[in-house]
Amino acid sequence: LATAPDKLKIKQGVWKSGHGKGRHRPKGRALNDQALSQVQALLGTRARRADLLIEHLHLIQDAYGHISASHLRALAEEMRMSQAEVYEVATFYAHFDVISEDDSPPPALTIRVCDSLSCELAGAQQLKAALESDLDATQVRILRAPCMGRCDTAPTLELGHRHIDFATVESVKEAISSGNTHAPIPDYQDLAAYRATGGYDALKAIREGQRSVDDIQNTLLESGLRGLGGAGFPSGKKWSFVRAEEGPRYVAVNGDEGEPGTFKDRFYLEREPHLFLEGLLIAAHAVDAARAYVYMRDEYPAVLHILDEEIKAMEADGLIETDYIEVRRGAGAYICGEESAMIESIEGKRGLPRHRPPYVAQKGLFDRPTLVHNIETLHWIARICREGPQILNGVEKNGRKGLRSYSVSGRVNNPGVKLLPAGSTIIDIIDAAGGMLEGHTFKAYQPGGPSSGLLPASLDSIPLDFDTLQAHGSFIGSAAVVVLSDKDKARDAALNMLRFFEDESCGQCTPCRVGCEKAVKLMEKDQWDTQLLEELSAVMVDASICGLGQAAPNPIRLVMKHFPEEI
């Protein structure tokens, strides 16, 4: 480098000197003044905090239908963040269309066809192919997408932000012609109607000291309520762990109902949102939370609208201070259903699961103690406080106490959310769903989402509840029940599940990232290499960071065990 100044003349436009300082051109992508003005107009008076990055990316995506490189650069400038930070977050989430300078923006209209197991059984693949054949690709973009939480109306798709249930080519064309791409808002119980039935009286009694936190906690423990997001941890015990930590403390609500086959949270929120909201405020009071955050999946636009309207009504009513409850909008990442990944996303980052310990009750949101609850759990907390523990512990079947909200879909006559005793068997659930479709014979079932795998019809007497399925290599999870018939292949269902895991792996750990990809390739073959698949499954279970990779092999193992003739 002794003659660096002379040699560097050959590389004009890179360096001014041989010391790596002073560029002829600005470092990185140049700032576009028009893009900056557009971003500033969209953000308005909103705070420029890093934890709001995903919210601000949504503003750009909603306004322009994509996020250009110049808008990313402008957003980074406006938020005083590096371009790399903004880019890595924007490209992590499936609902952000990041476009480089050399790429053309996508068509103005996007159709996302659900490819979950329930929709696949209902002909989603054929529907997608027909739409691709019939519609102009320059005007409409057609994508496959994971479960949208509408398995009871399969096949379903999303046109803009509007869902079309029982979708056909004709109904989609009609919707496109109408130009209506916004979600219809269902009839629901608003604040005034909820108050008229005694709503928020339980919260008032707790706030005024008529009922102590210990009393409420003991009532929950007596009821037997356990977390209904899938893990099943006793709900009341969580409060003690969080209260034991020094404040400020937060509540984070996991509304990212992304487990395929699950739609119970949406069912309750689109009908009785204030049962959930009262339960949230009771839990927040119990841990003396400084603020509450609700992380809601982007696939539920009607729910997002309802929560926005009703939280504003609660603020106007004096129930809560302004901005005490913040709703954060997901962006299409199943991994954010894992509690620590959800917290990362609320903080405006990629949804990568954290290593534990520490646990989120000790060091969660913004490194503070955080109480994490599921939507349905909070729904039941409010009901128990209003009606007493007997609404759960007073119901018993097959030696199990309580009630379960089963999301039922597949080859049944009347799919939907079925509130049944927790000791119900798959036969009870099929009966509640109107029985099998005509011409279909019960063959197999998914008891609790793809992570629970597939069980054969011969195992039809097991109560579908916490702790009853582990002996069979499965678990109840979110109680997402999909029923298969003799018209279906178990191996195809398992492949659908593993393709989902392959798509949704966050990529942080090799066993999950590579394991899911390799498993799909092996399962696509006519004959499965069962020894290699078992070795792969063992590595994924033992070495994956979070529950996604640890549970992903369940469909493989259960098909090998119960349906060997198919593989």
Residue ranges with predicted function:
Residues 279-281, 422-439:
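Short amphipathic, charge-patterned alpha-helical segments
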